[in-house]
């Protein structure tokens, strides 16, 4: 039986196990909660709310561990989660939860999307990016394509050449739909605490506004491997990358907000195989874009390469199916 003592605004509570809590400035509402509490956690939350948060976090981790151990795709080892068919790099818990949800609902499309996304993200040498990107993309409602790339947006300026654009900040980049835009990773600021710094900037549809740093809006595909900084505390959903692929011009609504690029366009059918094949097969001398497999523990080059080629192959197969369906309609 708990013992409760109140002296003015000071309340002292002794729980059944002998643990004693005391706190000043207790309100009448809080005191009534203490007196009428059905469980000790309700009392502890008033005196030490951080303890309840820790307990809830522990419970959440235990529940996640239980789900992972029942999974046919993920593994729980040494308090970390792994997707062994992809790599031996630990999977962020937010992504793991999404994979488990898709597995529970037998959603093969999402499972393939998540596998492809994680395959590409494993190529990112920055641990912060690997840990935070999935959370960031979901937080700011980016669309993740089946191939694992994600759709992002930016504004650009026109040039004197039709169909060729440039960045508003420096007017030095050649930007054209269907051509990779790249910046050496070493020239980018990888500090995720810096929201606006060196690198190629891409944004969520909820952040970008008409005429903000450019008069023309573009939808772009970005490889998770190329992201260099994910501002964890960003309030507007902008990140930095070292490469992106412009895929189309976009429109804005009457409020100057992005009209999101439609998902059912088949855009990945033509562009993604090119990016992946050229990225893998390119050499230092002749490739504008390369997919580097980082030399980090947990990455097996052959396994990652096989998964990359499978992504490209599946996209090509789907392209052929779409073409056949279109021809049959005609």
Language model segments and positions:
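ADP-ribosyltransferase catalytic core
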Residues: 79, 85-87, 183-254
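Extended, charge-biased low-complexity segments
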Residues: 1-124, 133-140
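Structural boundary micro-motifs
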Residues: 55-57, 73, 79, 92, ...
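Acidic surface patches and DE-rich sequence motifs
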Residues: 6-7, 15-17, 28, 167, ...
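Long, compositionally biased interface segments
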Residues: 221-294
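Long, compositionally biased intrinsically disordered regions
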Residues: 276-330
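Short, flexible beta-strand-to-coil junctions
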Residues: 8, 15-18, 154-161, 220-226
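ADP-ribose/NAD+-binding catalytic cleft of ART/PARP-like enzymes
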Residues: 2, 94-195
């Amino acid at each position: 039986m708990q013992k409760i003592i109140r002296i003015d605004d000071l309340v002292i509570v002794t729980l059944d196990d002998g643990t004693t809590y005391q706190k000043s400035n207790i309100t009448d509402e809080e005191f009534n909660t203490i007196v009428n509490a059905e469980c000790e956690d309700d009392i502890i939350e008033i005196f030490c709310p951080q303890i309840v948060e820790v307990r809830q976090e522990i419970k959440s981790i235990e529940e996640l561990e239980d789900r992972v151990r029942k999974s046919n795709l993920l593994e729980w080892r040494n308090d970390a989660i792994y997707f062994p068919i992809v790599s031996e790099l630990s999977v962020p818990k937010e992504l793991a939860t999404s994979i488990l949800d898709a597995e529970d609902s037998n959603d093969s499309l999402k499972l393939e999307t998540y596998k492809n996304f994680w395959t590409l993200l494993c190529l990112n040498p920055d641990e912060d990016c690997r840990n935070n990107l999935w959370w960031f993309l979901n937080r700011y409602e980016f669309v993740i394509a089946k191939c694992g790339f994600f759709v992002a947006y930016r504004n650009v300026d026109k040039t004197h050449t039709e169909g060729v654009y440039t960045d508003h900040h420096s007017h030095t980049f050649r930007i054209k739909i269907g051509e990779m835009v790249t910046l050496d990773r070493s020239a980018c600021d990888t500090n995720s605490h810096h929201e606006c710094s060196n690198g190629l900037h891409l944004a969520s549809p909820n952040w970008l506004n008409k005429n903000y740093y450019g008069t023309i809006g573009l939808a772009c595909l970005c490889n998770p491997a190329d992201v260099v900084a994910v501002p964890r505390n960003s309030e507007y959903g902008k990140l930095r990358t070292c490469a992106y692929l412009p895929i189309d011009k976009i429109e804005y609504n009457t409020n100057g907000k992005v009209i999101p690029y439609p998902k059912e366009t088949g855009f990945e059918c033509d562009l993604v195989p090119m990016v992946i094949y050229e990225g893998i097969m390119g050499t230092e001398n002749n490739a504008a874009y390369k997919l580097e497999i980082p030399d980090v523990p947990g990455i097996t080059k052959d396994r990652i390469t096989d998964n990359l080629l499978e992504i490209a192959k599946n996209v090509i197969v789907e392209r052929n199916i779409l073409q056949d369906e279109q021809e049959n309609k005609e």
